[in-house]
Amino acid sequence: MTTAILQRLSTLSVSGQHLRRLPKILEDGLPKMPGTVPETDVPQLFREPYIRAGYRPIGHEWRYYFFSLFQKHNEVVNVWTHLLAALAVLLRFWAFVETEGLPWTSAHTLPLLLYVLSSITYLTFSLLAHLLQSKSELSHYTFYFVDYVGVSVYQYGSALVHFFYASDQAWYERFWLFFLPAAAFCGWLSCTGCCYAKYRYRRPYPVMRKVCQVVPAGLAFILDISPVAHRVALCHLSGCQEQAAWYHTLQIVFFLVSAYFFSCPVPEKYFPGSCDIVGHGHQIFHAFLSICTLSQLEAILLDYKGRQEIFLHRHSPLSIYAACLSFFFLVACSGATAALLREKIKARLSKKDS
């Protein structure tokens, strides 16, 4: 018996040694990549306030930037937070489909499908922007414009499910006529404001750039969250027992926390150079926004399952299809805006190089 135990302990020890060597094995298996560089070795466009090091050098092959997913640099946490969140959304939705037997062809399901699509879209576009933007100046602008398109798509996807699944009757009777058109416009305005701010202002960025980003996005959030906020407030005033309402509450709280870290460069402002790889504000923003999305998804799945009678009483299939068609119209408008400003950037960079 003692011999068997010692053999097992020996096996565990060997396994532990292999696990400790796993990061080194993975690193050795990847192509040899350039190391990161300090801020003085990259153009001004790529520098972030109070982030002194951990930048990837520009001008390398695309392969390098894709494989930098496994390299230690100042964007890698931003990439992984949204990559893991996208996988979590997919897995949670798939588990719901397997459990509930989702009727794919039903009009009742369409807003939910578009919401999940919009969530995956914004998370994917965001991680691609942070992963690939260091390739060149044009790539930097291009991928961040794509990121902003993803944000507008997610905003409207959220508006759809809040409107169809989460709103209570008192709010619905007052705002149903103009809510979705206004949400679509605010989604496009948010994309336009972010793209224009990126195009118009250069580092070091003035305060006006943040205003162009935050104000349209803030208006979109206030509008999109209004059906949820109204329902949550009434629920808590009456001694809330709804599980979905608690998830919606968490969604709001996590979003507000993420918005703070997006707007303010903390904690790196107080510890310049100490938060280069892990711990700077944009990473915290990504983490809380990911948790916000997962809380929102959980709330919407509960609403989808538990409020079907309310949904079917309010909405005809035709009105649902019309509302969901506007989703693709918003995608087209936001994409066209981003493409137009990208062409302007491309012309400006060409003139600069000539």
From Swiss-Prot:
Ordered alphabetically, the record's keywords are: Cell membrane, Developmental protein, Differentiation, Lipid-binding, Membrane, Oogenesis, Receptor, Steroid-binding, Transmembrane, Transmembrane helix
Q: Name one GO biological process term.
A: response to steroid hormone
Single GO cellular component annotation? plasma membrane
Q: Say if the entry is tagged with keyword RNA-binding.
A: no
Highest rank taxon of the organism: Eukaryota
Residue intervals on the Extracellular side: 97-111, 196-213, 265-283, 341-354
Cellular localisation: Cell membrane
For this protein, the record's Pfam families field holds: HlyIII
Give TM segment ranges. 76-96, 112-132, 175-195, 214-234, 244-264, 284-304, 320-340
Q: Which residues lie on this side of the membrane: Cytoplasmic?
A: 1-75, 133-174, 235-243, 305-319
Tell me the GO molecular function terms.
nuclear steroid receptor activity; steroid binding
Record's function text: Steroid membrane receptor. Binds progesterone. May be involved in oocyte maturation.
Designated name of the protein: Membrane progestin receptor beta
